[in-house]
C-alpha cells in the first residue's frame, strides 16, 4: 500500500475529477494522506483558464522538486487542463514529474503508475477520446461521502468563446447517459449525500448531440431520487437557457432557488467579440423567465473586465447591468491572454492599471449590493442544509449553551448559526440536517442567525423557502 496526496487547482469540475482520481487510487489499494511530504504518490490537478491558475500549478510542482530529490522513489503526476495544454513541455520543464496526464486519461492512470514504478518510465498521455469512461464514474472514493457533492453530467464544450481554452483542453461536448448519472447519484445518496450539484461546461445543452433527454427532463428524474434534499447545477450558457428549464423552478421542489448565469459583459460590442452569441437584451429576457418562474431567485454571474477592445463606455454598460440585475454575487476576473484562445491575437489590449481600476470599481459596486441584499434578510427564517461546524465555533462569544454550525440556504448564501442546547438535544442537528434559521445579521458575504427548528428526516423539498 502506498500513500497518495492530491492537490487541486481550479473549478468544481477539477474538484470532481480529483475525487475520481482519489477513488482510482483507493481501488488500487492506496490510501490518502493530508500532506505531500507524507505521500509516495503526489498528483497535481491543474487549471489553465487564467494565467494565475497556471502560475499556482507550476509553483506547486516546483516545490515538489526538493521532495523528489530527497525521495527519488516518490512518483509525481501532473494532470488536468494545463497538462492537456502543454503535454511534454511540462515533462521537459520539470524533471521531478513522472507522469503528465490529460483531461481524458484518468482511466488509464493505473497502468501509467505501474510503468513508472516498475520500469522507471516517464509518461505523457494527453490522448482525447470520444466516449466517456463510465468505469471511472462508478468508483466511489473515500472523499465521496459528504453532505454536498458534485457529479459531472457532461464534459467538453462546443461554444468556442474567444477568450477560453476549454474546448481545446477538455474536448468537444459529450453527455453521459441519464441512467449512469442517476445510478451515481443514488449511490452517493446512499453514502450520505443530501445536495448534488450537476456539472458541465454548458448544462443547458445536455443531451442535445446524443439525442438524450433534455436537461430539464434530467432534473425532473433527479428530483425523484429518495433521500436527496437539494439539486443545484452549473454552468449555464445564456444562449441555451430555455423556457422549459425556467419552468422547472416552479415544478421541482428540490431544485434550489439559485442560478449561475455568466454574463461576461454588459456590452453588446464586447459580447460579439467574445463570440457569446447573445445580446444584453436577450440575456435580460432569460433572467426575466427565471424570476417569473421563481420570485426571489438568487442570481450569480461571471464578469471579465479588460477584454481586448473594451472601452470605458463598454465597462460602464457592464456596471449598469450589475445595477439593473442586482446579482447576489459575482465572480470577476481581469482578462489574461491564454495560449490557443483566439482573443490572444486581438488588438486593443487594455493595460493592467486600467484593468485593476475597473475590477476594483466593479467589486465595490457588487459588494454594496450583496451587503444590502443580505441585510434585507434580517428577521426572516431561512431553511439551511447543515454542512458542518462553523469556523466560528471557537470564538469567545459563543457561550457554553450553544453550538455553532454552518450551511447554505437554497439561494446559496452561507449561513453561520447557533443551535441552543435544548434544540440540539438528541443529535437532531448535524451534517445533512435541514434547519430553520432566523437571520439575525446580514453580513458582507454571509448570514448569521439562530436555529429555531429542525425539519423532520425526509422533508427534503426546500427549494422555495428563499
From Swiss-Prot:
Catalytically driven reaction(s): N(6)-dimethylallyladenosine(37) in tRNA + (sulfur carrier)-SH + AH2 + 2 S-adenosyl-L-methionine = 2-methylsulfanyl-N(6)-dimethylallyladenosine(37) in tRNA + (sulfur carrier)-H + 5'-deoxyadenosine + L-methionine + A + S-adenosyl-L-homocysteine + 2 H(+)
PROSITE patterns in UniProt: MTTASE_N, MTTASE_RADICAL, RADICAL_SAM
Single GO cellular component term: cytosol
MTTase N-terminal domain boundaries: 2-118
Domain TRAM: 375-453
EC primary class: transferase
Family statement drawn from the similarity comment of this UniProt entry: Belongs to the methylthiotransferase family. MiaB subfamily.
Subunit details: Monomer.
Protein name: tRNA-2-methylthio-N(6)-dimethylallyladenosine synthase
Lineage: Bacteria, Pseudomonadati, Thermodesulfobacteriota, Desulfobacteria, Desulfobacterales
Amino acid at each position: 500500500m502506498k500513500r497518495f496526496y492530491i492537490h487541486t487547482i481550479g473549478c468544481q469540475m477539477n474538484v470532481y475529477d480529483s475525487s475520481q482520481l482519489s477513488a482510482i487510487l483507493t481501488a488500487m489499494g492506496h490510501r490518502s494522506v493530508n500532506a505531500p511530504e507524507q505521500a509516495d504518490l503526489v498528483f497535481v490537478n491543474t487549471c489553465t483558464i487564467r494565467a494565475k491558475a497556471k502560475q499556482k500549478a507550476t509553483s506547486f510542482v516546483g516545490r515538489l522538486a526538493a521532495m523528489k530529490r530527497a525521495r527519488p522513489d516518490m512518483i509525481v503526476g501532473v494532470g488536468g487542463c494545463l497538462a492537456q495544454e502543454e503535454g511534454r513541455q511540462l515533462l521537459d520543464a520539470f524533471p521531478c514529474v513522472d507522469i503528465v496526464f490529460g483531461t481524458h486519461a484518468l482511466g488509464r492512470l493505473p497502468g501509467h503508475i505501474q510503468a513508472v514504478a516498475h520500469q522507471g518510465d516517464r509518461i505523457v498521455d494527453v490522448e482525447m477520446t470520444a466516449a466517456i469512461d463510465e468505469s471511472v464514474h462508478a468508483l466511489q472514493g473515500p472523499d465521496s461521502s459528504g453532505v454536498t457533492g458534485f457529479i459531472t453530467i457532461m464534459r467538453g464544450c462546443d461554444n468556442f468563446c474567444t477568450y477560453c481554452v476549454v474546448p481545446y483542453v477538455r474536448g468537444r461536448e459529450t453527455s453521459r447517459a441519464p441512467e449512469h448519472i442517476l445510478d451515481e447519484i443514488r449511490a452517493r445518496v446512499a453514502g450520505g449525500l443530501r445536495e448534488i450539484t450537476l456539472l458541465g461546461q454548458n448544462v443547458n445543452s445536455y443531451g442535445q448531440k446524443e439525442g438524450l433527454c433534455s436537461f430539464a427532463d434530467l432534473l425532473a428524474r433527479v428530483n425523484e431520487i429518495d433521500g436527496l434534499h437539494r439539486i443545484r447545477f452549473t454552468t449555464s450558457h445564456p444562449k441555451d437557457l430555455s423556457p422549459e428549464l425556467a419552468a422547472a423552478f416552479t415544478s421541482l421542489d428540490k431544485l434550489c432557488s439559485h442560478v449561475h448565469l455568466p454574463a461576461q459583459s454588459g456590452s453588446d460590442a464586447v459580447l460579439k467579440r467574445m463570440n457569446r452569441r447573445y445580446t444584453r437584451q436577450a440575456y435580460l429576457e432569460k433572467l426575466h423567465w427565471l424570476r417569473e418562474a421563481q420570485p426571489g431567485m438568487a442570481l450569480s454571474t461571471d464578469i471579465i473586465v479588460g477584454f481586448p477592445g473594451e472601452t470605458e463606455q463598454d465597462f460602464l454598460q457592464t456596471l449598469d447591468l450589475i445595477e439593473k440585475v442586482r446579482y447576489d454575487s459575482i465572480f470577476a476576473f481581469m482578462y489574461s491572454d491564454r495560449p490557443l484562445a483566439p482573443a490572444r491575437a486581438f488588438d486593443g489590449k487594455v493595460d493592467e492599471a486600467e484593468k485593476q481600476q475597473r475590477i476594483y470599481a466593479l467589486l465595490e459596486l457588487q459588494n454594496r449590493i450583496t451587503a444590502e441584499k443580505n441585510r434585507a434578510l434580517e428577521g426572516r427564517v431561512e431553511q439551511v442544509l447543515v454542512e458542518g461546524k462553523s469556523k466560528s465555533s471557537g470564538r469567545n462569544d459563543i457561550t457554553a449553551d450553544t453550538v455553532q454550525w454552518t450551511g447554505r440556504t437554497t439561494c446559496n448564501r452561507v449561513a453561520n448559526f447557533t443551535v441552543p442546547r435544548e434544540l440540539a438535544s438528541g443529535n437532531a442537528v448535524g451534517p445533512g440536517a435541514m434547519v430553520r434559521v432566523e437571520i439575525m445579521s446580514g453580513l458582507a458575504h454571509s448570514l448569521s442567525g439562530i436555529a429555531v427548528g429542525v425539519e423532520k428526516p425526509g422533508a427534503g423539498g426546500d427549494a422555495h423557502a428563499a
